[in-house]
Amino acid sequence: MHVTRINLKTDKDMKKREGLINFCLKGEIKYVAIGWSHIYGTREIKDYRDYYDIVKGSEKRNGKRINSALNTFLDTKADDLFWTRDLDGMYWICRAKGEAIPKCDKELDIGAVVPVEGYLVGLEVPGQISGSFNRVNGGIKQSLDKEKEIVEYSKYMFNSRAGRNVYEVKKMEGGLLNNLSSFDLEELARKNSGLPIAEKP
């Protein structure tokens, strides 16, 4: 299972950014998406592998290295987790429902999507997650797999927001608690004390 930070709002055109965020996070069906919509029309694209190969060839011809986000989508499987943000800076946790698929929207520059189950988390997340969005030249995506605590936190947060246990969360000696936001620490304390649960932000 992979946990990845993905930026959805890289375009400088505010209308495009807003349209992309609305398409990905505000609809009944939610997605994480990447661009390269310009390659559509060059040849038939049946699946993500076709899309990937065409983009890779196009980038190579233009003397560019392939963007790592393309490989991330190629490797995505059901139950992989993504962290993203909306235009208000709110964090979202998203679970992949399956593999990446080609989807063309030239106006929003969408070339491929991963259908997801996504939930608003709020403004407070561990520093390792928030920091990954603020890195200079951080790119479209960053893998968060190396930090075991972040993987477990991400699974915990998805379960919490979904209201069901999709993931088994491993018990960690203090590590998981160190990564909880103050709101989630309070919620956890309330659950264990029998007090009413606070409303989610």
Please identify what each model-predicted range represents.
Residues 2-77, 86-88, 92-201:
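Mixed-charge (Asp/Glu-Lys/Arg
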